[in-house]
């Protein structure tokens, strides 16, 4: 039962192979804490909200937290502020464990591989992994899996570029950070992480669409958002290019290069054109063959993780050790 696990800033997602079908689960990374009272218990029972207990409180998490918060006139709390795990907050860590349990069922037998991606900005190499990454791996191990961490960019190449022999540039445009991976035949040659805060751009667009001025100024609002989005995308792509050039990684890219890209912002109407414009302005010194924007960006990274887990599960022990 191989599993791909995408631990993103705004949402956790899993995709597992049961042997007969693929099973997807997701959980938003927000929560609500209320007192453990009979009234709140009845509310949770009537809504069938996912929750746990913490001392004298009830912790509601995921989409259920938003629904209950609306009923109680309260506000949900984001778990991963700035894309980072909460520090010095054992309650928040317990909530994080509950969220992982909600989307990652206990392994039925053996120790199947779970390939996971973590919020951007953390070192992923075994000798530089932070305590936060090790904590996330421990949560996966407690569910009975053998955890393996991969980058979101690597997952994108595996998910989208099978037709290019799993070679190209994988881009994950996250809410807080953007990850880029140079991959050749399924092997990651280089990667970099760029702070992007694209989640704010998505929120800005949704807010403008829902505003009272949206109907009468829709064209102006759209044009303004597109300019802002293109400017920020160009900056991110330029910074990634400079980072990979400074490392000498650009010369490792096979040309013409294939690109695989996913992220919440890619669901915006007309994103393909905005990306192509930003790419042209960012000055990458490579020829591009194809650009694939994930058709299902929500689970693209989890799917790449699942593919990696299946491949690793088929490998010999000697190869995995290498």
Where are these regions (language model features)?
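Nucleotide/phosphate-binding catalytic cleft detector across ATP-hydrolyzing
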Residues: 1-25, 29-50, 63-170, 185-199, ...
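A structural feature that tracks compact, well-ordered secondary-structure segments
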Residues: 179-181
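Long, charge-dense
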Residues: 198-210
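Long, charge-rich alpha-helical interaction segments
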Residues: 213-220
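Conserved blade-ending motifs and adjacent loop-strand segments that build the rim/top face
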Residues: 295-298
């Amino acid at each position: 039962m191989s599993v791909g696990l995408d631990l993103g800033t705004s949402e956790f997602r899993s995709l597992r192979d049961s042997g007969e079908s693929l099973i997807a689960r997701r959980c938003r990374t927000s929560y609500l804490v209320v007192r453990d009272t009979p009234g709140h218990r009845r509310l949770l029972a009537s809504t069938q909200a996912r929750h746990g207990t913490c001392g004298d409180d009830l912790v509601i998490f995921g989409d259920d937290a938003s629904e209950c918060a609306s009923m109680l006139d309260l506000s949900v709390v984001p778990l991963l502020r700035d894309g980072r795990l909460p520090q010095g907050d054992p309650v928040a860590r317990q909530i994080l464990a509950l969220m992982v349990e909600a989307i990652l069922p206990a392994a039925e037998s053996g120790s199947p591989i779970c390939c996971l991606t973590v919020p951007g900005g953390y070192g992923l190499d075994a000798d530089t992994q932070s305590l936060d990454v090790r904590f996330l791996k421990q949560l996966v191990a407690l569910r009975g899996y053998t955890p393996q961490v991969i980058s979101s960019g690597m997952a994108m190449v595996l998910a989208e570029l099978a037709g290019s022999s799993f070679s190209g540039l994988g881009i994950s445009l996250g809410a807080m950070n953007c990850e880029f991976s140079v991959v050749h035949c399924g092997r990651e040659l280089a990667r970099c992480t760029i702070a992007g805060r694209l989640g704010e751009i998505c929120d800005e667009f949704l807010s403008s669409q829902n505003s009272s001025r949206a109907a009468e100024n829709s064209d102006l609002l759209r044009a303004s958002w597109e300019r802002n989005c293109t400017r920020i995308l160009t900056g991110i792509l330029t910074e990634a290019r400079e980072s990979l050039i400074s490392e000498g990684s650009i010369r490792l890219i096979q040309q013409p290069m294939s690109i695989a890209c996913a992220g919440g912002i890619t669901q915006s109407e007309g994103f393909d054109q905005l990306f192509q414009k930003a790419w042209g302005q960012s000055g990458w010194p490579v020829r591009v063959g194809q650009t694939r924007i994930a058709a299902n960006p929500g689970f693209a990274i989890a799917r790449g993780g699942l593919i990696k887990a299946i491949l690793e599960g088929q490998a010999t022990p000697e190869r995995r050790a290498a």
